[in-house]
A protein has these predicted regions:
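Short helix-capping/linker segments at secondary-structure and domain boundaries
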Residues: 75-77, 142-147, 239-240
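A conserved FAD-binding loop/helix module that cradles the flavin
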Residues: 1-11, 214-240
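Generic secondary-structure signature for well-ordered alpha-helical cores
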Residues: 12-13, 49, 158, 166-171, ...
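Gly/Ser/Thr-rich beta-alpha loop segments that engage phosphate groups in nucleotides
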Residues: 63-66, 187-188, 211, 218-222
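A glycine-rich dinucleotide-binding beta-alpha-beta segment and adjacent secondary-structure elements
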Residues: 136-215
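Domain-scale detector for complete catalytic domains at protein termini or as standalone homologs
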Residues: 2-3, 124-125, 134, 173-174, ...
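Short Asp/Glu-rich motifs
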Residues: 27-28, 184, 235
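Predominantly flavin-linked oxidoreductase catalytic cores and closely associated redox partners
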Residues: 1-134
Length: 240
């Protein structure tokens, strides 16, 4: 596994743009204070792309199944080719921390609970929605003291909490290239016989796995592609 633009020239075939795939993302902001914290079953979005999954914070950014699957969408939406240079990235992703509730549902719940549970501290109330180890960071980013009672939080601050629960954003500055798990792009499939994996341009030349412009989400799909195309290529070559 991994992502490297090297050796594609050896294929003697037309090759699509080579890009990072299933890659952790590096953030502009230092996240070392919450490294190791996991958010479960959240929805991560970039423009119109949305992925549901877990997010793990690292010392340099974001990883976990949800992030690395979304990274494919991000990578494919950006015009670049690793055969030429690394991409320059300056973008924003958003995390819906409460995907089971609509914005209106969350607003209604906040309004009810802030009246009924006025003496409750906000850091304790947020345990209904967030993992404990993320609450302090979330409140710091929202500009609210963790020991504030619900009754003392004004409307503007309450709305900011709701907005951040539904759309908590991070600025992304690059892919974590050393930890990218697959390569997006490769030998153009239209020049490969799918029944044999043999090149349509050069007889007795076969391709398999990530040399091809084939990739999938995390979860063993890329290994399956490698095993199946490798088996087919080897079997086809042995027939000749």
């Amino acid at each position: 596994t991994g992502c490297s633009p090297k050796n594609y020239a050896l294929t003697s075939q037309p090759v699509t743009d080579i890009k990072y795939g299933l890659s952790p993302l590096i953030t502009k902001k230092d996240l070392s204070d919450i490294a190791g914290v996991t958010l479960y079953d959240v929805v991560i979005s970039y423009k119109k792309s949305k992925v549901k999954g877990n997010v793990l914070f690292s010392h340099v950014g974001l990883t976990g199944p949800g992030i690395i699957n979304l990274s494919n969408e991000i990578s494919e939406s950006i015009s670049y080719n690793l055969l030429e240079k690394d991409p320059e990235i300056d973008l924003e992703i958003a995390i819906d921390l409460c995907p089971e509730l609509t914005h209106q549902d969350l607003t209604d719940k906040f309004n009810r609970d802030f009246q009924a549970k006025g003496k409750t501290l906000i850091k304790n109330y947020l345990k209904l929605f967030l993992t404990n180890s993320f609450i302090e960071y979330f409140l710091n980013e929202s500009g609210i003291d963790a020991d504030t009672q619900l009754s003392r939080i004004n409307k503007k601050s309450k709305n900011r909490l709701i907005e951040n629960l539904k759309r908590f954003t991070f600025k992304i500055c690059s892919f974590n290239s050393k930890l990218s798990k697959v390569t997006i792009g490769g030998v153009d499939l239209k020049h490969v016989n799918p029944k044999t994996m043999e090149s349509k341009l050069i007889p007795n030349l076969y391709f398999a796995g990530e040399t091809l412009n084939l990739h999938g989400p995390t979860g063993g799909y890329n290994l399956r592609i490698a095993f199946c195309t490798g088996y087919l290529a080897g079997l086809s070559a042995s027939w000749k």
